[in-house]
Structure formats: structure tokens, C-alpha cells
Amino acid sequence: MSLKSTLFRSALLTLHKSGLHSLSPPSLSGVGIVFMLHRVRPAPEHDGFAPNALLEITPEYLNAVLTTVSALNYDLVSMDEAHRRLQQRRFDRKFAVFTMDDGYKDNLAFAAPIFAKHRAPFTVYLSSGMPDGTLDLWWMGLEAAIRAQSTLDWRWS
């Protein structure tokens, strides 16, 4: 488990086990949580320039999050079920919803098996240009081009 995963899990468990979460007023505790994710894939081999890394988590991290959320007794539910609970004002149990934005292939390759292992539904919001290959992933190309340079000369004009 990575340091980031360990810290996140430890923070959630510390709040829960210490009871510190109970000091906040009920109006702030919420009835559920929605995790909005983008990419789930193994950590890249490079340590260079990677501004898009903040939109990525590793499969191990996702597994740790699902394990922790389940240990905190959240129901892992679909977006439809979360909507139903909110409409019916069913707040007896907290819920967690997971969404994947954009529809990267790694959602299927790396995230789906982990969600299946935890029996956790998830919703993929698919960018229309992903399936047919018409979406220009310019931000990934720009990142790779900059990372490949030993120096970058930029002049503001």
C-alpha cells in the first residue's frame, strides 16, 4: 500500500475510532459521499512532470478506499440507489457512491475488477469522443511533450 493510501486510510479510521467525527453537528455529517474519480492505473514508471497525476489513483489505493469505506459501515450503492434514498429521505444508513469520469480504458482494466471484488456498483460518465476515438486528449500529449524535455524555455508576451 502506498504512503498516500496509508495516510488516507489512517485519517478516516482515526476520525472514526477516536469519535472526533461525532463532535461535528449532524447537519455537517451528511448522509453519504460521492467519490468522483477519473483514472485508476498502476503508478507510472517516470517521476517527471505529471500535472495530470492528481486525477489518477492506483488500483491499490482504490482497494484501500473501498475497504475503509466498508469498514466504516457505509453502504456501497449505485447512483440510482443514492437518488432513491435522497428522494425518500431514507437517512438511516450512510452510503457511498463511486463515479468514473471520462471513460478511460483503465476504468475497465483496473477499476472494474476492484469494484467487483467489493461488490460495489459504479457509474461511468463517458465522454462522447472516447469510444469512437474522436476526442483529442491534448492535455496528455502536452504533458508527455513537456516531460520529454530537459529544459523548457517559456516567454510571456
Residue spans for each PLM region:
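Terminal accessory/targeting
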Residues: 1-98, 105-157
